[in-house]
Amino acid sequence: MQICLMDETGATDGALSVLAARWGLEHDEDNPMALVLTPQHLELRKRDEPKLGGIFVDFVGGAMAHRRKFGGGRGEAVAKAVGIKGDYLPDVVDATAGLGRDAFVLASVGCRVRMLERNPVVAALLDDGLTRGYADADIGGWLQERLQLIHASSLTALTDITPRPQVVYLDPMFPHRQKSALVKKEMRVFQSLVGPDLDADGLLEPARQLATKRVVVKRPDYAPPLADVATPNAIVTKEHRFDIYAGTPLTE
């Protein structure tokens, strides 16, 4: 994949070359999207809109730390949607990981989560965030146990994952109406990078085959159900629906 690769660390250790080789990235000086190594983290920038700033994954500080410490925890809609109850903490595959926010919330309340991300740039951002998170004295221990990244296309990987999870979580890219400034910024940068999720409808059936208990699909409240498959089971928040579908139980 072609993208502008930039190193602002001041180091001459070849980290950019290692990054490019690992994720199959090719430097393109004229690309409007840039993946930038800064002294703090790896970030994505839209060069023709510098005011948008950089997008990076941060599990340790910022909004994620606030959500972990002061958010609803088990009471969050995503936790209810995957079925967390009492001692039941399902094993989850997040097949559309994005920046890993919902996966992190589920991991923080005790679920083991495998994140799938097919875009190599987004996978590189997630990997960078995980590396920093794993090294953190406060959250590193449980984060290593509960949150992992698999770089693969969900459409193919969903048929190959073992062991099977109890829950598959899907949050496909959908054109957002007006949202908070942060989401708007991220969506603009993200959609410039990955484009619309045109094959998202194809995820529902393999997800239902893989999950032993349920599939949860996060949708904006105005969006039709994924693959136009309606379900009476949903958890509804102010702006989203978490549509719930039955999985395929394990056979003896």
Swiss-Prot record:
<dbReference type="GO" id="GO:0005737">
    <property type="term" value="C:cytoplasm"/>
</dbReference>
<keyword id="KW-0963">Cytoplasm</keyword>
<protein>
    <recommendedName>
        <fullName>Ribosomal RNA small subunit methyltransferase J</fullName>
        <ecNumber>2.1.1.242</ecNumber>
    </recommendedName>
</protein>
<dbReference type="InterPro" id="IPR007536">
    <property type="entry name" value="16SrRNA_methylTrfase_J"/>
</dbReference>
<dbReference type="GO" id="GO:0008990">
    <property type="term" value="F:rRNA (guanine-N2-)-methyltransferase activity"/>
</dbReference>
<dbReference type="InterPro" id="IPR029063">
    <property type="entry name" value="SAM-dependent_MTases_sf"/>
</dbReference>
<keyword id="KW-0698">rRNA processing</keyword>
<comment type="function">
    <text>Specifically methylates the guanosine in position 1516 of 16S rRNA.</text>
</comment>
<keyword id="KW-0808">Transferase</keyword>
<dbReference type="Pfam" id="PF04445">
    <property type="entry name" value="SAM_MT"/>
</dbReference>
<feature type="binding site">
    <location>
        <begin position="101"/>
        <end position="102"/>
    </location>
    <ligand>
        <name>S-adenosyl-L-methionine</name>
    </ligand>
</feature>
<comment type="similarity">
    <text>Belongs to the methyltransferase superfamily. RsmJ family.</text>
</comment>
<keyword id="KW-0949">S-adenosyl-L-methionine</keyword>
<feature type="binding site">
    <location>
        <position position="171"/>
    </location>
    <ligand>
        <name>S-adenosyl-L-methionine</name>
    </ligand>
</feature>
<feature type="binding site">
    <location>
        <begin position="153"/>
        <end position="154"/>
    </location>
    <ligand>
        <name>S-adenosyl-L-methionine</name>
    </ligand>
</feature>
<keyword id="KW-0489">Methyltransferase</keyword>
<feature type="binding site">
    <location>
        <begin position="117"/>
        <end position="118"/>
    </location>
    <ligand>
        <name>S-adenosyl-L-methionine</name>
    </ligand>
</feature>
